[in-house]
Swiss-Prot record:
Family designation: Belongs to the WD repeat WDR12/YTM1 family.
Region described as Sufficient for interaction with ERB1 and association with 66S pre-ribosomes: spans on this chain: 99-453
Species annotation: Vanderwaltozyma polyspora (strain ATCC 22028 / DSM 70294 / BCRC 21397 / CBS 2163 / NBRC 10782 / NRRL Y-8283 / UCD 57-17)
UniProt-annotated location(s): Nucleus, Nucleolus; Nucleus, Nucleoplasm
Upper lineage: Eukaryota, Fungi, Dikarya, Ascomycota, Saccharomycotina
Subunit structure: Component of the NOP7 complex, composed of ERB1, NOP7 and YTM1. The complex is held together by ERB1, which interacts with NOP7 via its N-terminal domain and with YTM1 via a high-affinity interaction between the seven-bladed beta-propeller domains of the 2 proteins. The NOP7 complex associates with the 66S pre-ribosome. Interacts (via UBL domain) with MDN1 (via VWFA/MIDAS domain).
Keyword rRNA-binding: no
Descriptive protein name: Ribosome biogenesis protein YTM1
UniProt cross-references to HAMAP family, sorted A to Z: WDR12
Protein's job: Component of the NOP7 complex, which is required for maturation of the 25S and 5.8S ribosomal RNAs and formation of the 60S ribosome.
GO CC, one annotated term: PeBoW complex
Keywords for the protein's UniProt record, in alphabetical order: Nucleus, Repeat, Ribosome biogenesis, rRNA processing, WD repeat
Ranges for the WD repeats: 101-139, 141-179, 199-237, 278-318, 320-359, 366-406, 417-453
Amino acid sequence: MSSDSSQVKLRFFTREQDESLHVQDAPMYAPISLKRYGLSEVVNHLLGFEKPVPFDFLIDGELLRISLQEYLTKHGLSSETFLNVEYTRAVLPPSFLSSFSNEDWVSSLDVGDNNKIISGSYDGVVRTWNLSGKIEKQYSGHSAPIRAVKYISNTRMVSGGNDRTLRLWKTKNEDLKQPVVDEDDEDIEDGKTLAILEGHKAPVVSIDVSDNSRILSGSYDNTIGFWSTIYKEMTVVDPMEELKNNDSKMSTAAKKRRKLTLKDGTIRRRAPLALLESHTGPVEQVSFDFKDNTVGYSISQDHTIKTWDLVTSRCIDTKTTSYSLLSLAQLPTLNLLACGSSARHITLHDPRIGSTSKITQQQLVGHKNFVVSLDTCPENEYMLCSGSHDGTVKVWDVRANSPMYTITREEQSVEKGVNDKVFAVNWSKNVGIISAGQDKKIQINKGDNIFKS
């Protein structure tokens, strides 16, 4: 019998909650020449759909991107093998929606529950954008490029930058439906700094916020800062006293930075609750554990992933990889940490596994330069997006080793390899996949209906 007419026995099943997508649980035969499209036709026929629904297929957790015959050959299986084939609604290609122009390179992004976008820029300004591309507010105060921004709530945010500080910002008057953060904030105007957080000795490049009013910051001074979103809970810093005590030890540049900050003499200054030390190289990203905010993670140019007990401020686990790590995202349902690296790939790690066990569970390959930003899909536990200095954003399903889709920069003035580096990505359920970088653009690729219903 020719390979074209050969068949394999299989069973289709799905984990989709929609009962209308469930086929009868019974084995059947299918041509081994079928690929994704042909299998999708078979499932639609079994479901009796007049309007076809595109599906993706997995065998033993591996996303099928080849024919059944090629799959059998790849895994050394014969056509006598019985296959359990999982199907799930296919992901549609994210289409370009819009882009907004900024004054300088955009280093960081976040999206609030109000669907407002905040951006941090190399011109030292934090901006709030609506989805029409209008700047609603600008927040000035940092004396150097901003490297990280994060919403605390719809009325509070935090930023960090090359001036070695974090700033707590008031974005608007408190909504009466939300709890009051600080009773004496009423004297602070919208768009003003609530407090300057000092303690790092090098640029602050990463920030994460927990739901229990805590902040983590990663810095190029090799430390992680642990702070409160409520400034009253932190120790007061007296800038004049510090300047006086350290005047003889401070460099000229340090003295200049300190004098610049003294211009904001009326702004509160606070010290960290703790500075966590263990890394031997710059800390590139930090994150609270999705399920337990007393646990934190950090990745560094020193090649390590560290797990922290934030109650005791102790490092409780270190995993050493072969490359500098530049970005971090959690896949909480899968209990995995995704790490972007200087080696151009993304590695998946299980933080529960001891450092003596296998360090890397999987590797995603496709980028051609540093992978500097990651974010997970809000609607699919297996998916994430990545931003790279190669000028692209890639969409991944971690069950496959190669990207599903590649998003390029839409700006006409972008020159490949010159001004196309992507510095930040964010995947929002309501807004879409947002990316920004060296082209001074905030780009949105359509996220609505990315999963066909």
